[in-house]
């Protein structure tokens, strides 16, 4: 085998390895519109005693679903109707909106990891059978990636770590400090809100490339 043939083979192998590495760092993306999670007590307060959420469609994360039920959320300066409830019911009530939504409401919710609502913004929810005022619970959710422990090992990351994601599309956009969330119950998927999606022309089903920071954030 001559030198030129060897160089050609080496170049091909390097290219294949590069493509494999790139593919291994690819993460599916999904756009999450405004929605709310309700406690059992608040489900009953909004929809009636003994009421249970009914499934409209399954979500990508196992066991989670979009309910048929919707509510109106009310802030100091405005309201938004038909905000989808996600099920099943949780231990606490939480409303997730985009920055654009918050401006319409006249509210100033903090950027938080889902579930971290302590000292967050107040919000009123209105349902067909009643309304409730929550002194905290309105947040803008941080961009995050759900993954299993096996996924985390493959990507070389751990729960609570932050990474960088660059979308692949007409308007490549880099999202910084994307939170890693690891659980055996999760399915690999990155979640961003509608503001982030609109800025990068990103749609559910698009992919991004994960890269690590030199130092943990």
Curated annotation (Swiss-Prot):
It is an enzyme of class 2 (transferase). Phosphate binds at residue 90. It comes from the Bacteria. It comes from Priestia megaterium (strain DSM 319 / IMG 1521) (Bacillus megaterium). NCBIfam families: PRK15070.1. There are 2 Zn(2+) ions per monomer; Zn(2+) and CoA bind inbetween the 2 domains in each monomer. Belongs to the PduL family. Keywords: Acyltransferase, Bacterial microcompartment, Metal-binding, Transferase, Zinc. Pathway: Polyol metabolism; 1,2-propanediol degradation. CoA binds at residues 31-33, 77, 84, 198. Pfam families: PTAC (PF06130). GO terms for molecular function: acyltransferase activity, transferring groups other than amino-acyl groups; metal ion binding. GO terms for biological process: propanediol catabolic process. Its cofactor is Zn(2+). This is Phosphate propanoyltransferase. Involved in 1,2-propanediol (1,2-PD) utilization within the bacterial microcompartment (BMC) dedicated to 1,2-PD degradation by catalyzing the conversion of propanoyl-CoA to propanoyl-phosphate. Zn(2+) 2 binds at residues 144, 146, 191. It catalyses: propanoyl-CoA + phosphate = propanoyl phosphate + CoA.
